[in-house]
Swiss-Prot record:
The keyword Plastid does not apply. The active site is at 179 (proton acceptor). Its EC number is 2.7.11.24. Its main location: nucleus. Residues 35-319 form the Protein kinase domain. The modification Phosphotyrosine is found at residue 193. It is an enzyme of class 2 (transferase). It catalyses: L-seryl-[protein] + ATP = O-phospho-L-seryl-[protein] + ADP + H(+); L-threonyl-[protein] + ATP = O-phospho-L-threonyl-[protein] + ADP + H(+). The gene is pmk-1. It comes from Caenorhabditis elegans. This is Mitogen-activated protein kinase pmk-1. GO terms for molecular function: ATP binding; MAP kinase activity; metal ion binding; protein kinase activity; protein serine kinase activity; protein serine/threonine kinase activity; RNA polymerase II-specific DNA-binding transcription factor binding.
């Protein structure tokens, strides 16, 4: 039996100078003193998010604490990938990284990583639970998703995990794409496991090793359908059920499409399925406008080669009220360090520690420049 004082120390470790400890939903958070009034607002597979006030800036922020970022090499790589991507990206429809910190005092002890971003009012999954949106709102939201995607894709990056809970919206209907932990640069052999199943493109489940940025466009199609109907389009209970639900809407693929599938097992499985005819989207989405239906048909095409790109989808007549090519920026060249490799947890700790240190140096330098400008003016 531990003495009570020892137990208290284990549950609530003594924080480093400038930090304090707070327990939230049975989880111990150790944060800088200038983040106050922490309130839990969400939990996911990879982290927990709290709202907080930043006394330095006088703004409300969201703080994300990663769940066991160094539990495995996969967890560590995911944390690094998201940190690197968010540092490189700068776009109105992509969440901004305001701060990143660890409460641990040296690289050997690093266990926790926290990201800080602007606090948004809600995410799309929250909104879908409480209200139905009119067509103008739907157009504006989908346009902003695609605007962010165009930027992401122009950097040769695939998000791979677009879903309502990864899309934040404020009270002015302004939208930001969240959670880049599964995002990665395109390569010749893309891994099969990504994304929440319900929004996952069929070519990923069909075990193709190579897929393209149009997997994200499929996800946007699923989100658009859900915004229109208020219901998840393909709520599969497992991979097989998911694929069956998709084909009950898109119809059984033809031989031309099947030839593109590299997995012989997947091809044979599909050939042995009962023939399904394509559903009439006008009946399936009876409440949608003809323009919305046309865009849905294009984005939810079973053949990824026949889906539009994010840029092409933005140019669709359904989004004509918002499309403005002069205000749809693409990314500058990004140094994502995507070739960084580490074989041990300790090596990943060193890489992430250095990334956090570099971020904080750049923020401190920017703050100094801002102070100098204020003094000069």
């Amino acid at each position: 039996m531990f003495p009570q004082t020892t137990m208290d120390h284990i549950l609530h470790p003594t924080p480093r100078e400038g930090y304090y400890v707070v327990e939230l939903n049975r989880s111990v958070w150790v944060v800088p003193n200038y983040y106050i009034n922490l309130t839990p607002i969400g939990t996911g597979a990879y982290g927990t998010v709290c709202a907080a006030e930043c006394t330095r800036s006088g703004t409300r922020v969201a703080i994300k604490k990663f769940n066991r970022p160094f539990q495995s090499i996969i967890h560590a790589r995911r944390t690094y990938r998201e940190l690197r991507l968010l540092r490189c990206m700068c776009h109105e429809n992509i969440i901004d990284l305001l701060d990143v910190f660890t409460p641990n005092e040296n690289v050997n002890d690093i266990e926790d990583v926290y990201f800080v971003s602007m606090l948004m009012g809600a995410d799309l999954s929250n909104i879908l639970k409480i209200q139905r949106l009119n067509d103008d709102h739907i157009q504006f939201l989908v346009y902003q998703i695609l605007r962010g995607l165009k930027y992401i894709h122009s950097a040769d990056i695939i998000h791979r995990d677009l879903k309502p809970s990864n899309i934040a919206v404020n009270e002015d209907c302004e939208l930001k794409i969240l959670d880049f932990g599964l995002a990665r640069q395109t390569d010749s052999e893309m891994t099969g496991y990504v994304a929440t199943r319900w929004y996952r493109a069929p070519e990923i489940m069909l075990n193709w090793m190579h897929y393209t940025q149009t997997v994200d466009v499929w996800s946007v199609g699923c989100i658009l359908a859900e915004l229109i109907t208020g219901k998840t389009l393909f709520p599969g209970s497992d991979h097989i059920d998911q694929l069956t639900r998709i084909m009950s809407v898109t119809g059984t693929p033809d031989e031309e499409f099947l030839k593109k599938i590299s997995s012989e097992e997947a091809r044979n499985y599909i050939r042995n399925l009962p023939k399904m005819t394509r559903r009439d989207f006008k009946r399936l989405f009876a409440q949608a406008t003809p323009q919305a239906i046309d865009l849905l048909e294009k984005m939810l095409h079973l053949d990824p080669d026949r889906r539009p790109t994010a840029k092409e989808a933005m140019e669709h007549e359904y989004l004509a009220a918002y499309h403005d090519e002069t205000d749809e920026p693409i990314a500058e060249e990004m140094d994502l360090n995507d070739d960084v490799r580490a074989d041990t947890i300790d090596e990943w700790k060193k890489i992430i520690w250095e990334e956090i240190s570099d971020f904080q140096k750049n923020v401190a330098f920017a703050d100094e420049e801002e102070d100098e400008e204020k003094m000069e003016s």
